[in-house]
Amino acid sequence: MNVFAIMATCGRHRCAERALTCFLKQDYQGEHTLLIHNNSPVSQSINLPPLPANKHVILLNRSTDEHANRYASLGAIYNDSIKVVPSDADLIIFWDDDDMYLPNHITSGVEGYKKAQEEGFRAYKPFYSFYRHSGGIALVANNMEPSVFVQASEIKRLGFSNTTSDQHMQWYAGLGDKIFVDMAGKPTLIYNWGDGDKWMGEQFVEHIPTFKTSGNPGNPSNFENYRGFSQEHGDEVLTPIADELIAAYYAEVINQNT
């Protein structure tokens, strides 16, 4: 199956680099593409290693809609992003820039979707995901959109509401009971709630600032508040993070849940 992942990002340079690295580490053997829709007026370029023939990364620097107006919501950004999805894409998934994804995220999700599809479902998600927060890492039941694998035609049909924080509800609610929630599904999404200093042993590695967009979808200023904080543009070149650092993030999850 051909999987198309969408990452909307704006002024969270180190988050985007980490999420990009998670995509490059995916072990999926089928076609898979990551669209990075950078909606900041500060353009980014990308520094990629040689990629296998089945793995693709697209960088879209676009901060305005079709009317040349600055995007006013995350939903509007996603509605433009899905216009880039090719006709041969089977599944659409969401690759939030501040979250992380185990190397088997796509492989496991596609396997689950294929089984669900046989029963007439249009989307698949495991019941649990990892929840990474200041107190550690836990397994939680959730409706987190990045854990859902959705038939591409359904996302294109239903689209997103032009809102922030609840923009996914249009397709999520539209699918209703066509989403198969797998109680035995492998948790592969690492959902971050806040970030901060990263240490490897006693060595300080980096600080990743994240500013959450959720929690107040009814406030029309929420999106402007988010953009006001998201001003981390780095060197304006998205570069994968070091292998040992992404391995340390993965080990943090695995060690606390074995």
Protein language model regions, located:
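Acidic donor-binding/catalytic loop of UDP-sugar-dependent glycosyltransferases
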Residues: 99-112
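Short beta-strand/loop segment that forms part of the nucleotide-sugar
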Residues: 31-41, 60-64
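C-terminal catalytic/acceptor-binding lobe
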Residues: 18, 162-258
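Active-site beta-to-alpha loop of glycosyltransferases that engages the nucleotide-sugar donor
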Residues: 7-18, 28, 39-41
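Short, acidic, metal-binding catalytic loop of nucleotide-sugar glycosyltransferases
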Residues: 21-31
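Active-site nucleotide-sugar/metal-binding loop of Leloir-type enzymes
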Residues: 75-91
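Short beta-strand-to-loop element that shapes/binds the nucleotide-sugar donor at the catalytic cleft/hinge
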Residues: 122-137
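Short beta-strand-to-loop acidic/aromatic patch adjacent to the donor-nucleotide binding site
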Residues: 89-100
